[in-house]
Curated annotation (Swiss-Prot):
Keywords: Cell membrane, Cytoplasm, Guanine-nucleotide releasing factor, Membrane
GO annotations of cellular component type: cellular bud neck; cellular bud tip; cytoplasm; plasma membrane
GO molecular function: guanyl-nucleotide exchange factor activity
Pfam families in UniProt: PH_GEF_YEL1, Sec7
GO BP term (any one): regulation of ARF protein signal transduction
Gene3D superfamilies: Arf Nucleotide-binding Site Opener,domain 2
Subcellular location field: Cytoplasm; Cell membrane; Bud neck; Bud tip
Region annotation Disordered: where it falls in the sequence: 1-29, 213-234
Protein name: Guanine-nucleotide exchange factor YEL1
Native source organism of the sequence: Lachancea thermotolerans (strain ATCC 56472 / CBS 6340 / NRRL Y-8284)
InterPro entries per UniProt: PH_GEF_YEL1, Sec7_C_sf, Sec7_dom, Sec7_dom_sf
PH domain: residues covered: 333-475
Protein topology in the membrane: Peripheral membrane protein
Entry superkingdom: Eukaryota
Amino acid sequence: MTGLEGAQNLTVADKQLTPDEGVLTESPKMTNIHEIVEDTAASSENGDSEAKEIAAKIRAGTLENVEFTEYANYLGTPGNDQILREFLLLLDPLPSSITGTLRKLSSSLYFIAEAANLDTILEALSRQWLSEHNKAHYQDNYKLCHIVMFALLMLNSTLHNSEADLSFTIEEFRENTINALQKESPDIDVPSFNRELSLCYYQLDNEQLPLLRPPSQPRYSLSGRRTNGNGGHSNMKKASMLSLERFQTNQSLISTQNSMATLTSRDTTANSNYRMRNNKPLQKLYLDEPFDAELQDLNGTPWLMDSMVNVQEASKANNSTSQLLSSPVTRKRKLMSWFRKHTKDTIFNENIHAADTDNWQHARIRIYQGRLFVYKFKGFGRERSIPRDIHKWSLEMCKRSCSQFHVYNLYGTIASLVQENIVASENSNVSSASFLIDFPHGLDSTSGLSFRFKTRNQDEAKQFTACCNFWSARISPIPSAQVEMISNEEYGWSPRLLEGESGAEQVNLAQVKLAHWKPLVGLDAIFSELDEGIALWDFDSQLGNLRVFTELLGAQLDEHNAVKPKMVELWAKKGREYQPQFEAAMENWNNKYLYLNKQYQKHLVYLKALENAVQFYERSKSVKNPETKNAAKEQS
């Protein structure tokens, strides 16, 4: 039995009844039953208070009579269940990703203990995480979450412990974990778990789980660098993953001297909803600009859209990120298939939504300050009718009266008109229109989520699309332009292979070994590692950096397209024995093209959204100042 399979069997031993516990005792008399109840209630309250106090001391590292390194064993000991629950409540709200949750736990507790005690903690953590983040593929079964957490702990050890006697490739990790999950629930959503496990693997590979140090141990070395034990390589990969700074190199973004950035913790969708439920102010997702005060409360602008719509919700089954992160699979293709015109895989590929009208729900939606607010209504009265003046209600009244309320942060989202709106005639009898909002994969509880909204007309759909893309462009981090590791691996298009080295003989293709191309980071994986911090940039810097980034991506696309004819010429002129290598090389080329093109299309949408907002602001100023406009006409 493998370690992953044993995850389900690591439980505390069943309690045995002692002879004393098996003896029947006299039932209480009615005269003192109230006294017993009161004593029991008082004892329960005292127990809760004591458990909270002990949990707080463990969190602070000040619990007496228990060694700091024994806290986990103490929490997992039978009889300390209430203390464990209170300790985990101190970690609320839990991150929406399981790796983020484990990272938060191991940053708050010295998480080395006996297997049974660790298992008890993970079981309680699984229950709490699932109650806060009810992701569909977990089937409301905490045991599935428990298995994944245990698997990630094992993976963390094998990836970062030099003395470990085994190691997992990403394929082995996924296969072993899926097998363990299927033994618990045979009908699990394998594609969803595969995507999540792939992202978890890369997250832990880039940065191991922290090991909490006692309060007396310094967190920083004399050099000023944090002593996290990860080493320079891990830190370098993490910097590439987060891309929170504009590195001044030829392959990165260059900020102006006047650019401004503020580093803050990223507010997750779970945190936003937690704050809303508890009537706490939401965290700012952007830096205020002077024009925000003028336009942020003006409905029908890139700054604010608020209206009644119909909404459908769906999850993406596939995206190119999961394809790029998956293991290479050789496809059966004919040699000449690569000469066909390539079909662009853009961000505008639409999700399959159910056409049944019963799936539509009435909702008031509001896009404002980097967030999407959704108030769903089921109807009122016997006829289940929807009041016509909901759009005039205060937000607090909407929150109290709606059947369901949720707020979503717009990091990395893309809004687009549904294709049927674009091709429909303006004189058509169809008055309504639809638009989509797609959330990136790997981003907290919204991973792969997609909404379809039906508006009153096409103009309103366009306004919602522009507003969503404006805020996404403004708050989303811009990744590094470097898309692959600098290495000596051959993918099928290196200058050495296509042109030959100067003064040397042509490369023997029979001896060429092609590696599987994959990006330095997945299309959306940048968002999954942003629990620790994110840089907020002023508007001009974000706009300027988007221009630089899209230009760099465009240049890389042109450069990549230029090598394809050379590859075809090199490989196609050889005999049939080279066909497998030719197909592998073209598969690599295609994967890189899809990656670059998708990044380019997405950030081009962001760039246009910010530029259109600038034009809108300039027009609004000219309307507000007609005297200036008339004076300009007189001078001309």
